[in-house]
């Protein structure tokens, strides 16, 4: 519609513009007398017009006449006609434009009126439909209208709500669209009517029987029609579909209200019952059915009342008590200590000894004696209600100064010592560690109390018989000045000699191991045999022609297998050493007998087996740890401060005369301990120096690569274990005769490998990982 109006206006303006242009042209033609009047469809210039020929230079162009002269030549009547024509043209153009605009406005108003009529019809249809829906819901919602709606006044009927005037409906709908009653109401979560709490009920004796179940009457607010008064409905609580309604008439409106929450049930009253009865309650839950119920069940309402007041359980208990009142319950026997045994199941169809025991009546148990002897104090017998009786009949109650767990540990350690407090006090006063021994002082040091426990024990001035024996022991020991400081000093003194002897022996073992390893001729011959064998195997490679090797190579000899896999390189070296030791290189090449061979073999094996006993200190040194030895010296030096602390406390001791022997013994021991610690440090330095020299003697400059200084002894110890096993294998293997050209011959002692060995000939190969050379 708007496009049509705009198009009409544009056409009117275009027509007006053309008329104005035509008027201007007409005026110009009338003023000059040259331009003729033309029609609207004619162009501005004629088609046959051609430009005039050019003028010659001799011809003079006359100047144009002045405007006054031109105007004077035209007559007065012609100017008047031109003005009138202009006015007429302008008036015609204005009328045309006005007509077009008026037509456009008429079209717009007509379109608007049609839209309003269509909107009114649709609104009337919606109102009629809403009224019909309300009229259809009236019978189902009238039962709950007392809580949610207001009934229409008596003058309004269902017909008024259905058949409505469209104009009236349109006006009312527009008025009610802004009403707050038509806004969506929030949905309230309300329980089902079957799960609503029941009102309080009364006791069965005062509660009359309930009436038969009936539908509750209809309750409304406001007015209702005669047809609604005659009907009775029961409506469930408000739902999402019934909670939203609209009013369609001024005479019949339903007000939407939410159901208020129900209050808690009031306590039971003795007032007469109200005429209106609630519906019967739902059946009792499973837990309620498990409870004891009376013999005759009351009505549902009375049952709910009895459940709330708790009265039905009491009569049931009283009735049962009356039934069992004649038979008294026997007293529960006291609990005795358990006997843990394995019970056997009865075997049918077989006679056992237990059948005879079961049928025998020769033995009867004295229950009173058993209860007096084997009563379980923790079980709590039937007659032992007194706490003192449950603890064994003693009414004396002990007082605890220490934590129960801590006290239990002290009691266990004190029981293991099995000494009295007087003996401990005497040993601490005299200062002689040999009286009780180092183990006693070590256990006593673990019993040392904390500062807080010490204050509690010293501050207790009550009856000593009311505290625990372990607490009494600690309290007696704490009577000695700085008692547990003395215990630490005595423990250090008792263990000092053992620690010093262990260190002295360990350092001596290291020195002896170094001497044995450097002076052993058999070990030197073994190294020579391994070096020559390795050079023969590595001949022609970059690992050949070695002059030395690390002792770690000895551990790899047993890993190199022969071609047939029956022997190893270490077995071969052992056999060669036995052969070289059994034959003399200066003897003639006479083939010895078989008896001499066996004797040579036994002598050689005996010689090699003696290498382990020859290097016994090396095996002991392999079990030592240099870090442990150094740590023991540092610990001895640090613990010596405990002795110095006890001597410093001498000035604070109140009874110095009684402890004079202790302090004198500690002073003498302190001087000796300082001297011994100094000697141990010197022995440690000497041992480390010898170990370093021995390692350099075998490894040269590779000593810096060793992870710890005593590794050389560990390597030799492992090799000796492997060598002993190989010697046992060789001793069990029969002697193999070396054959050459059908005869056996003797290899000189200076030769490492024989030129020919048909039976034991092998092709040995090794890799960089299996052997190393220097």
From Swiss-Prot:
Keyword Transmembrane attached: yes
Name this protein carries in UniProt: Formin-like protein 13
Annotated Pro residues bias: 51-67, 194-216, 262-286
Composition-biased stretches (Low complexity): 68-78, 242-261
Domain FH2: 326-749
Taxonomic lineage from the root: Eukaryota, Viridiplantae, Streptophyta, Embryophyta, Tracheophyta
SMART domains assigned to the protein according to its UniProt record, in alphabetical order: FH2
Disulfide topology: none
